[in-house]
């Protein structure tokens, strides 16, 4: 494994550990999810460019579209929870009912 892949994998693991350890606030969880998506995007792009996968050139763009949708939904949920309860604690998400 080259150093580039090792560093990208380390960034993904650090974001995952941040997501698992700092779950109290919704904003920190969203930032850790964005770090994971960014490291996945870079890993996918580097892998496709190094291995010359011509059929998979659109895969990083599709991943970015899903990351943008995830960020938009997460921020809208953050705004809704902070307007309703005044805080962005993840514990408040258990109180939401349809």
From Swiss-Prot:
Coiled coil ranges: none
Chief location: mitochondrion
Known catalytic reactions: a ubiquinone + NADH + 5 H(+)(in) = a ubiquinol + NAD(+) + 4 H(+)(out)
Bilayer disposition of the protein: Multi-pass membrane protein
A Pfam entry, by short name: Oxidored_q2
Any one GO BP annotation for this protein: ATP synthesis coupled electron transport
Localization, UniProt: Mitochondrion inner membrane
Keywords: Electron transport, Membrane, Mitochondrion, Mitochondrion inner membrane, NAD, Respiratory chain, Translocase, Transmembrane, Transmembrane helix, Transport, Ubiquinone
EC number of the protein: 7.1.1.2
Catalytic class of the enzyme: translocase
GO molecular function: NADH dehydrogenase (ubiquinone) activity
Domain of life: Eukaryota
GO CC terms: mitochondrial inner membrane; respiratory chain complex I
Functional description taken from the UniProt entry: Core subunit of the mitochondrial membrane respiratory chain NADH dehydrogenase (Complex I) which catalyzes electron transfer from NADH through the respiratory chain, using ubiquinone as an electron acceptor. Part of the enzyme membrane arm which is embedded in the lipid bilayer and involved in proton translocation.
The family this protein is said to belong to: Belongs to the complex I subunit 4L family.
Oligomeric and partner information: Core subunit of respiratory chain NADH dehydrogenase (Complex I) which is composed of 45 different subunits.
Descriptive protein name: NADH-ubiquinone oxidoreductase chain 4L
Species whose genome carries this gene: Phoca fasciata
């Amino acid at each position: 494994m080259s150093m580039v892949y090792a560093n990208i994998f380390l960034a993904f693991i650090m974001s995952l550990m941040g997501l698992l350890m700092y779950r109290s606030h919704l904003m920190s969880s969203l930032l850790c999810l964005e770090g994971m998506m960014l490291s996945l995007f870079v890993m996918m792009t580097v892998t496709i460019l190094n291995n010359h996968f011509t059929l998979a050139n659109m895969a990083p763009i599709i991943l970015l579209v899903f990351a943008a949708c995830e960020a938009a939904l997460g921020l809208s949920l953050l705004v809704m929870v902070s307007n309703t309860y005044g805080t962005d604690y993840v514990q408040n998400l258990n109180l939401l009912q349809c």
